């Protein structure tokens, strides 16, 4: 049978490669290009710790899956490693042939080995002795007795030595040591004294390599290479666990994350085979876990690379704007009572949402606030404002998702802090994740008779830090049907049965039936010779059932544009997908919004909300999607989608071989960079 879907993880690697390509764009500020190498590397680290770790567990028989066999999992891990190795060549090429020369052009000399100019020899030697040497603790490595534990995602230097005076062939002549780089004590990147117009930088590991003779007196240094281990970081919670059991499992398993099973052993590919073989045997590394790297590993650290030359063009992002209709003296409540409000972050300031909560804290007629928490910032202003509301006599209910990956500890800590302040905390639902990003404020008039509710439905988290980095949209509305639906959703989260939703689309209830109805209507229009039109913007498209519906629509003549940032398992360019185009946008901000357009014969229907079209989102999570009913806001989202589809600078097509194909060029004046164009569009409207 023909394979009609890309493999999820291979598709993700195609996205991450597109991230890497931003480092090659010489129209960007230099340090923004460097940051994209950091993002690429950080993404890859998490990918191995979660996705590859899962496949490896299945391949070794340590875990079971209904979707993979031992053989298919092993083959997929091999395919992933081959693609990562291929991308490594481009990462090295971009770094060495693009980034380093660009730094030199700006008089920033970044040493790439232990060899430095003679005028820096004394500095390197003195800096090592005074700042680094006290924190080094070499540990011997033996095949028979490993006495060191390699910590997750920490950089180590593996050293091979010859004992001076020992005859060739004697058993103790060749010895091996490992040293953890003292990241917590000394920066990864060291600034050396400026000479003339030139600034100099150096990796800490290269300074250590230049002084190995000081660390190991009595030995001759044979060679040294960097290594690192990535460990399985996934946390599996028993679906049958109750709330208290979930809390205990999260606490225990988060602690074990740092000592999880090895899923990747990364090493300097210049390491001789016999050196590598020794380490593999000593640390009991599975050969399938071996991933060659460059001489400098953990390139995610490049986000901390110093910029000593202030004349280098800084990273300049659009600054969040505040709507003039919502200055601090204006009531958001009164505005939303008259007209729905749509905000787009980070173009609009997240302060507007904070002000919405702040107004709820201090408005005497507000009785209750309800919010979902998936990922919040540390020392969160949102959480602090909710605590202030509880202390001010408001009833506050927060649903806390403890199973939000890598945010488990923060969510648990903030939940305990809120609970201590008198907030009603509802924890994770067994067997489900709650991914909906919704808030509800209930307010009665001064006589206590009329109830007015204010709903907020968003594509992004209530996180003031990521709201400056992720491109998301959120709707404020007092629409009575949507508000009532949101009431029902919060009742569902509190354990009430059989909710009914009329306008809000909620995963595991009415979302799939409504999506099928919307797609069917576009198919019927196309079959009648009318225009069938679908535009879907999301982070990931993976669910085979929904992909098949899009294939069906394409074959019926529906024109479909997909704006998918990351995973896309739909294969374009086939007979069954000839009317489907896949666009991917990677730029300054992380595209995170989920916005859906259905042409509806000229009376378009638009929606925004939290789910991607992945099986986990559609079938195993609680997600919320709202229709956009206000004609002006509908047009605003249509314009946003149109701007993104016309992007000729940061958008590319994904072809039938998962290649990122740049869109055909146009005259320079017509080139659209959608994030910046949309920012200007919104600025003109304020």
Regions found by a protein language model. Give the residues of each.
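N-terminal localization/anchoring segments of enzymes in phospholipid and broader phosphate metabolism
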Residues: 1-534, 552, 556, 568-686
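Short alpha-helical
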Residues: 274, 544-545
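Polyanion-binding catalytic cores of nucleic-acid enzymes and NTP/SAM-utilizing transferases
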Residues: 546, 550-552
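Hydrophobic alpha/beta core scaffold segments
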Residues: 559-563
């Amino acid at each position: 049978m023909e394979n009609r879907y890309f493999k999820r993880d291979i598709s993700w690697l195609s996205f991450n490669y597109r991230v890497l390509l931003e480092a090659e764009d010489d129209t960007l500020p230099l340090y923004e290009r460097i940051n994209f190498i950091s993002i690429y590397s950080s993404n890859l680290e998490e990918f191995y710790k979660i996705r590859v770790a899962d496949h490896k567990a299945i391949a070794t028989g340590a875990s079971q899956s209904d979707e993979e066999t031992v053989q298919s999992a092993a083959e997929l891990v091999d395919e992933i490693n081959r693609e990562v190795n291929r991308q490594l060549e481009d990462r090295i090429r971009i770094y060495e042939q693009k980034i380093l020369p660009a730094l030199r052009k700006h008089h920033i000399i970044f040493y790439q080995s232990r060899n430095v100019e003679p005028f820096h020899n004394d500095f390197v030697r003195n800096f090592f002795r005074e700042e680094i040497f006290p924190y080094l603790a070499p540990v011997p490595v033996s095949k028979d007795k490993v006495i060191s534990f390699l910590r997750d995602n920490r950089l180590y230097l593996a050293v091979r030595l010859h004992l001076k005076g020992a005859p060739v062939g004697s058993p103790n002549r060749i010895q091996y040591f490992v040293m953890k780089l003292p990241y917590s004590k000394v920066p990864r990147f060291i600034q050396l004294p400026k000479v003339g117009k030139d600034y100099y930088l150096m990796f800490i590991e290269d300074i250590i390599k230049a002084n190995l003779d000081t660390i190991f007196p009595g030995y001759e240094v044979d060679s040294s290479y960097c290594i690192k281990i990535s460990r399985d970081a996934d946390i599996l919670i028993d679906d049958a666990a109750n709330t208290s059991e979930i809390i205990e499992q999260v606490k225990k398993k988060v602690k074990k994350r740092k000592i999880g099973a090895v899923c990747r052993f990364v090493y300097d590919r210049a390491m001789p085979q016999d050196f590598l073989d020794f380490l593999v045997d000593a640390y009991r590394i599975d050969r399938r876990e071996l991933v060659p790297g460059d001489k400098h590993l953990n390139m995610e650290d490049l986000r901390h690379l110093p910029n000593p030359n202030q004349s280098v063009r800084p990273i300049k992002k659009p600054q969040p704007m505040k709507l003039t209709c919502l200055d601090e003296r204006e009531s958001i409540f009164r505005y939303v009572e008259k007209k729905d409000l749509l905000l787009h972050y980070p173009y609009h300031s997240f302060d507007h949402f904070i002000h919405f909560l702040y107004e709820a804290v201090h408005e005497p007629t507000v009785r209750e606030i309800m919010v979902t928490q998936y990922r919040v910032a540390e020392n969160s202003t949102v959480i602090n404002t909710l605590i202030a509301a509880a202390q001010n006599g408001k009833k506050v209910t927060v649903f806390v998702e403890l199973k939000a990956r890598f945010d488990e500890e923060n969510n648990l800590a903030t939940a305990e802090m809120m609970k201590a302040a008198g907030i009603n905390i509802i924890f994770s639902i067994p067997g489900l994740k709650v991914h909906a990003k919704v808030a509800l404020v209930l307010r009665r008039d001064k006589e206590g008779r009329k109830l007015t509710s204010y709903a907020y439905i968003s594509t992004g988290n209530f996180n003031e830090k990521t709201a400056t980095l992720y491109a998301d949209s959120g709707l404020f509305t007092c629409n009575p049907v949507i508000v009532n639906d949101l009431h029902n959703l919060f009742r569902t989260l509190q354990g009430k049965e059989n909710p009914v939703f009329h306008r809000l689309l909620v995963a595991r209830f009415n979302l799939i039936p409504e999506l099928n109805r919307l797609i069917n209507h576009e198919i019927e229009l196309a079959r009648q010779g009318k225009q069938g039109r679908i535009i879907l913007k999301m982070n990931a498209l993976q669910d085979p059932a929904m992909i098949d519906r899009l294939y069906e629509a394409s074959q019926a003549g529906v024109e479909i544009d997909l704006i998918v940032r990351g995973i896309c398992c739909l294969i374009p360019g086939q007979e069954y997908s000839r009317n489907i185009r896949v666009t991917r946008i990677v730029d300054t901000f992380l595209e995170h919004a989920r916005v859906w357009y259905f042409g509806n014969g000229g009376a378009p229907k638009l929606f925004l909300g939290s789910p991607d079209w992945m099986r986990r989102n559609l079938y195993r999570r609680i997600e919320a999607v709202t229709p956009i009913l206000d004609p002006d806001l509908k047009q605003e989202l249509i314009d946003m989608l149109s701007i993104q589809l016309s992007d000729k600078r940061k958008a590319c097509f994904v072809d039938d071989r998962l290649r990122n194909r740049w869109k055909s060029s146009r005259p320079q004046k017509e080139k659209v960079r959608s994030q910046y164009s949309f920012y200007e569009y919104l600025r003109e409207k304020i």
